[in-house]
Amino acid sequence: MANCCHHYRVKNARLILVEDDPFTRATLGDALTLHGFDIRARVGTAFDAIDAQRKHDPQVALLDLDLGVGASGIDVAIALRKNNPKIGIVFLTTYKDPRLINSNIPSLPDGAIFLNKLEMNSTTKIAIQISLAILKPLAKRALPWVRSGPLSSMSAIQIEILKDIAAGLSTAEIARTRGVSEQAIDKSIKRISKNLGIPKSADSNLRVQIVRAYFENKGQGI
């Protein structure tokens, strides 16, 4: 299997790593160096990512979606692509759907590759996807949360209500902040639970089940 994938490996490609967690930034950067990539910069903020692009002219950027307070990885990727229309873009995150960061996220740059950290059990798989992003930076690619997953059929408003529930807001508080009735929020919660595959028998602890599903889809199971 390794031999069939070797063709897709790009050696010595200039790469910048944008990841706000210092440990992940260090270990992943070291691992990708062993795979032959030229890691020009390892940064944790949007500002440093743009500065690294200006200094190093990378062929590809590997980005976490959630960079903490401020710009997201998607915002950074859009800025990088504006400066270089053919830079390869790869997102590596625990989130199964980026709308859990921001329900009104901008469109991902054309050709962006989205990888889930929990499904990438080896850096070899990540290295192959990075190479594909370099070879075909603008190729049409299907995004995993669009075609499948419990959140794929949920609207932006439902995602926001899901986040409100996870934050501990009551039905009355959610209704008040959204300017709608509590009955409307109750209906939305029932639709959300259906989308998440929560059985009707779970009514007594429905909120607990919804919160658990929220964190599972963030890659932070409880």
Language-model-derived ranges and their functions:
Residues 30, 51, 128, 163, ...:
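DNA-binding alpha-helical recognition surfaces that contact promoter or target DNA
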Residues 139-164:
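Regulatory hinge/linker segments at domain boundaries
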Residues 7, 69, 153-154, 203:
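Residue-level marker of regulatory loop/turn positions in helix-turn-helix DNA-binding domains and
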Residues 170-206:
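Recognition helix of helix-turn-helix DNA-binding domains
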